[in-house]
C-alpha cells in the first residue's frame, strides 16, 4: 500500500468515521471511530518515509478535486480564494491515544494505547479555528 501511495496507484486517502459507542457496537451496529487518528496516521506514514508532498496530495488535494462538484467552495490547497479548512499537525509531538482524549461521540478508539509520532493540534473549518485537544474555539472567521 505504501508503494501504491508513492507511485500514484492509490488516488487518495480517506477514513471512515462511524462514531458508534461500544454499547451500540455490541447491539449489532457496525463501524469504528477513525477520524480522531487520521492526522496521527499521516504522521506515522511520514515517519516511515512517505514524503509529506505525497501525503498532502492524497489526503487533501486529490480528494478535493475529485469531490469538488459536491462543494460550494474551493477546497484542497492553500491558495488565495481557497476555503480555509485544514488540520494543523505537530509532527514532533508524539502521543499515545487514551480514552479520555477521544473527542468523537463514540468515546473510544480502536487505537487506544497506540503510540503515534505526531498529532493534530488545531483544525480550521471554513476559517473558524478550533483547538483539537478540547474542541475549544480559538478564533472566528
Residue ranges and their predicted role:
Residues 4-7, 12-13, 17-91:
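His/Asp/Glu-enriched, well-ordered alpha-helical/loop segment
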Residues 1:
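Phosphate/diphosphate-binding loops
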Residues 80-141:
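C-terminal cap of metal-dependent C-N hydrolases
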Amino acid at each position: 500500500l505504501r508503494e501504491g501511495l508513492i507511485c500514484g496507484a492509490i488516488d487518495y486517502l480517506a477514513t471512515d468515521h462511524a462514531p458508534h459507542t461500544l454499547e451500540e457496537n455490541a447491539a449489532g451496529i457496525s463501524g469504528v471511530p477513525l477520524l480522531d487518528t487520521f492526522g496521527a496516521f499521516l504522521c506515522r506514514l511520514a515517519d516511515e518515509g512517505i514524503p509529506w508532498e505525497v501525503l498532502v496530495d492524497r489526503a487533501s488535494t486529490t480528494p478535493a478535486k475529485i469531490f469538488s462538484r459536491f462543494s460550494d467552495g474551493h477546497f484542497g490547497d492553500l491558495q488565495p480564494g481557497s476555503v480555509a479548512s485544514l488540520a494543523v499537525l505537530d509532527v514532533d509531538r508524539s502521543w499515545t491515544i487514551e480514552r479520555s482524549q477521544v473527542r468523537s461521540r463514540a468515546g473510544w478508539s480502536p487505537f487506544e494505547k497506540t503510540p503515534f509520532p505526531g498529532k493534530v493540534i488545531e483544525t480550521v473549518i471554513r476559517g473558524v479555528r478550533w483547538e483539537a485537544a478540547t474542541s475549544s474555539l480559538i478564533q472566528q472567521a
